[in-house]
Amino acid sequence: MRGYKIFSGSANVEFARQVSKYLSLPLSDAGVKRFSDGEISVQIDESVRGKDVFIIQSTCAPTNDNLMELLILTDALRRSSANSITAIIPYFGYARQDRKANPRVPITAKLVANLIQAAGIDRVATIDLHAGQIQGFFDIPVDNLYGSIVFNDYIKAKHFKNAIIGSPDIGGVARARSVAKHLGLDIVIVDKRREKANESEVMNIIGDVKDKEVILVDDIIDTAGTIVKAAEALKEKGAKSVMACCTHAVLSGKAYERIASGVLDELVVTDTIPLKEQLPNIKVLSVTPVFAEVIRRVYHNESVNSLFI
């Protein structure tokens, strides 16, 4: 039997440890060092010849370092005669640069897809890509899982009396509709106008939220400006409470300050990105069992279809 091995980059080592624990398979040894000038050096410390290899590495901040580390690890494993290499990328950086929104700008998500393939990766597994069409940037299989696989059960366990699912912007309506359909709830939409990057202005509430428990769903929470302003607008319209479920906790800039303000009653995120701080109103749900199951099924050539909801 060919066997498989799991390697971790330095972006989210605890995530990789939890995956390996679920599979009862110790993480394989690889040394990742940096030279004095910042260059990354990798040494694979055990044989991978003929093995199916899985690399766990989010490309979160520092995005460029973590991306390069993934590529260099892949090159080292490919040159060490691994049979196949699957990249488990819980958070896929640069996904927000998925189209030409303005003249003379790059489509960086496509460039990253090209780099990943050129390095020698055979398959990618991720969760809640900012734009689903990024799967089409690859000529290799890409499994894009959904955060709702953990959020839905958490929401059900809350036993809300008068809940409604909300989208913090027009672009997230499809995601909100999917969650609402699964839970049998109505949806509300917060229509906003973005004046410039990382700043947004809430404009209008589409739907009735009076005396309701609003659950906002989104893929990424970055500066938390959009979510917090949406929560403020919803409460001004009579919402009883506002909870947000966001898969990827980027949480840059003044995000922690905004969340700590208490406008959001609760922020629920996953562990695709390690948190820099712990706040009483932040709840972390783990998606490591989901990715562990992806690894097991891919290795055994089993369908992963049931992991998509």
Swiss-Prot record:
CDD domains for the chain: PRTases_typeI (cd06223)
Top-rank taxon, per record: Bacteria
GO biological processes: 5-phosphoribose 1-diphosphate biosynthetic process; purine nucleotide biosynthetic process; ribonucleoside monophosphate biosynthetic process
Swiss-Prot/TrEMBL catalytic activity: D-ribose 5-phosphate + ATP = 5-phospho-alpha-D-ribose 1-diphosphate + AMP + H(+)
The EC number(s) this enzyme carries: 2.7.6.1
Binding annotation for ATP: 37-39, 96-97
Pathway: Metabolic intermediate biosynthesis; 5-phospho-alpha-D-ribose 1-diphosphate biosynthesis; 5-phospho-alpha-D-ribose 1-diphosphate from D-ribose 5-phosphate (route I): step 1/1
Active-site annotation: 192
GO molecular function, one term: ribose phosphate diphosphokinase activity
Binding of Mg(2+) 2, residues: 169
Binding site for D-ribose 5-phosphate: 194, 218, 222-226
UniProt key word Transmembrane helix: no
Location within or outside the cell: Cytoplasm
Keyword set, alphabetical order: ATP-binding, Cytoplasm, Kinase, Magnesium, Metal-binding, Nucleotide biosynthesis, Nucleotide-binding, Transferase
Record text on cofactor binding: Binds 2 Mg(2+) ions per subunit.
Cofactor(s) needed: Mg(2+)
Pfam families xref list: Pribosyl_synth, Pribosyltran_N
Keyword Kinase found: yes
Physiological role: Involved in the biosynthesis of the central metabolite phospho-alpha-D-ribosyl-1-pyrophosphate (PRPP) via the transfer of pyrophosphoryl group from ATP to 1-hydroxyl of ribose-5-phosphate (Rib-5-P).
Family of this protein: Belongs to the ribose-phosphate pyrophosphokinase family. Class I subfamily.
HAMAP family hit by this protein: RibP_PPkinase_B
PANTHER family: RIBOSE-PHOSPHATE DIPHOSPHOKINASE FAMILY MEMBER, RIBOSE-PHOSPHATE PYROPHOSPHOKINASE 1, CHLOROPLASTIC
Protein name as annotated: Ribose-phosphate pyrophosphokinase
Protein's organism: Campylobacter jejuni subsp. jejuni serotype O:2 (strain ATCC 700819 / NCTC 11168)
